């Protein structure tokens, strides 16, 4: 069997649809999805097998990254640093831009990335045909920069094989790097953590999801049930009260929603215990961020 394998960094501005694309390719709910921008905070490896037209069985290891953005808060700097690291580690990059975006995001990407890349224009199902053609024409001025230009819709599964074909074409022949049926090398407790975070974005408004995070305190994995003990961390006591809600109604909704998604992903029953704590300025303190698993690479220039 002829095989290829390689790491592919998936880069884009917030809300470009990176996580939706990966979940569609995997036919599973692993990457956090929200209609709110900047939901993804940590790099996640997602493994997609694909047989290309040349007969290669390719193992495409996508590096799902936080959206490219610049803010002074240390948490946001951690997120940007992970996206930059993924670009450096990958053999190939895919820059995903919404059909509704201007060209500034792609121009910023070009200033940051020296790796070969594919430009993918997403959400074409949300625009009329003329608008899609116009956007593709605008990107043609950069034709010497990208390997291929692929319009697609993750929601409608349009042109996804074309994207995978382009990626596989530019990967080097190699033995597979992971087991055949593995979709991610993430630990299940880390996937569960992201599911809880997704529920925060689903049920809380305004700034609270952006000023909150989740810590798994204890994870017990049994044959028929996973037991998850976690706490939600916010920055203010007033936010804690909102997360809990009157008579605990909000935390119950968040917990139920998260638990059902966990059971779907883990394919077993899940017991979930959620607590809420307030810790002022946690998103600005390096030690607090390290405890939550964030890595900040300082610029040493």
Swiss-Prot record:
Matching SUPFAM superfamilies: P-loop containing nucleoside triphosphate hydrolases, Prokaryotic type KH domain (KH-domain type II)
Spans annotated as G1: 12-19
Subcellular location: Cytoplasm; Cell inner membrane
Keywords: Cell inner membrane, Cell membrane, Cytoplasm, GTP-binding, Membrane, Nucleotide-binding, Ribosome biogenesis, RNA-binding, rRNA-binding
GO CC terms: cytosol; plasma membrane
Record region (G2): 38-42
Cited function: An essential GTPase that binds both GDP and GTP, with rapid nucleotide exchange. Plays a role in 16S rRNA processing and 30S ribosomal subunit biogenesis and possibly also in cell cycle regulation and energy metabolism.
Protein name: GTPase Era
Species this chain originates from: Helicobacter pylori (strain Shi470)
Organism lineage string: Bacteria, Pseudomonadati, Campylobacterota, Epsilonproteobacteria, Campylobacterales
Gene: era
């Amino acid at each position: 069997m002829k095989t290829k394998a390689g790491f592919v960094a998936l880069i884009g501005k917030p809300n470009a649809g990176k996580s939706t694309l990966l979940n569609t390719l995997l036919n599973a709910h692993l990457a956090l999805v929200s209609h709110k921008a900047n939901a993804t905070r940590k790099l996640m490896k997602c493994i997609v097998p694909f047989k290309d037209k040349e007969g290669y069985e390719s193992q495409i290891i996508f590096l799902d990254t936080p959206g490219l953005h610049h803010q002074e808060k240390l948490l946001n700097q951690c997120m940007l640093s992970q996206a930059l690291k993924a670009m450096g580690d990958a053999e190939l990059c895919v820059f995903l831009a919404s059909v509704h975006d201007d060209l500034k995001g792609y121009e910023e990407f070009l200033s940051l990335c020296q790796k070969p890349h594919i430009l993918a224009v997403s959400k074409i199902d949300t625009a009329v045909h003329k608008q899609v053609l116009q956007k593709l024409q605008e990107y043609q001025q950069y034709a010497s920069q990208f390997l291929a230009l692929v319009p697609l819709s993750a929601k409608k599964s349009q042109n996804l094989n074309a994207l995978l074909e382009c990626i596989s074409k530019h990967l080097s022949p190699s033995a597979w790097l992971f087991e055949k049926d593995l979709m991610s090398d993430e630990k299940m407790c880390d996937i569960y953590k992201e599911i809880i975070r997704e529920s925060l974005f689903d049920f809380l408004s305004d700034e609270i999801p952006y000023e909150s995070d989740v810590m798994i305190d204890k994870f017990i994995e049994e044959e028929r049930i996973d037991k998850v003990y976690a706490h939600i961390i916010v920055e203010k006591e007033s936010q804690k009260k909102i997360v809990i809600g009157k008579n605990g109604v909000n935390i119950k909704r968040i917990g139920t929603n998260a638990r059902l998604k966990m059971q779907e992903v883990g394919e077993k029953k899940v017991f979930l215990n959620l607590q809420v704590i307030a810790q002022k300025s946690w998103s600005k303190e390096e030690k607090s961020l390290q405890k939550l698993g964030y890595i900040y690479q300082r610029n040493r220039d």
